[in-house]
Amino acid sequence: MISMGEVRICIQYYDSPCGRLVLASFADRLCLCDWSDNPFAERNMLRLTRNMKTSFKTETTSVLEETKRQLDEYFAGKRKAFDIQLRLAGTDFQHEVWNALLDIPYGATKSYKDIAQCIGKPKAVRAVAGAIGANGISIMIPCHRVIGSDHSLTGYAGGLEAKRVLLGIETQI
């Protein structure tokens, strides 16, 4: 039961050129930027409520408004890096993988194998792929920059067309 004054996860939506994103913040940090039609969005939201021991409410916050502003700049080709405080909900291994994603430069790509090697676990390619798939902060933790070893576009929570658009923004194709 939620008590009066308990901090809850605030949620808003952002309509991007690639589809609708669900944004959430908790304690002045962004904790979710996920594609609303992602089949795993519900799982990511459940992970947040368990991790933070609270529930969602539809309300804006300064963090969510700033996130929307920075996303607008990104989609307009005016922003290459995000300056939003994040609150990640995941395992230590997932955090390690997500931090490796943050090191992929704007406009560059890496393979799942590259990420596995970056974190010192070269045989953990499938586990790395699973951690990338569990990323609940799309675009800002740039899982769209991960491609197949053969340079093919591979799965993405927002769909391959969204991945193509995001990479196109970053490479000015």
Model-derived segments and their meaning:
Residues M1-P122, I169-I173:
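Basic nucleic-acid-binding alpha-helical/helix-turn surface characteristic of O6-alkylguanine DNA
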Residues N44, P142, A162-K163:
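Short, hydrophobic-biased amphipathic alpha-helical segments
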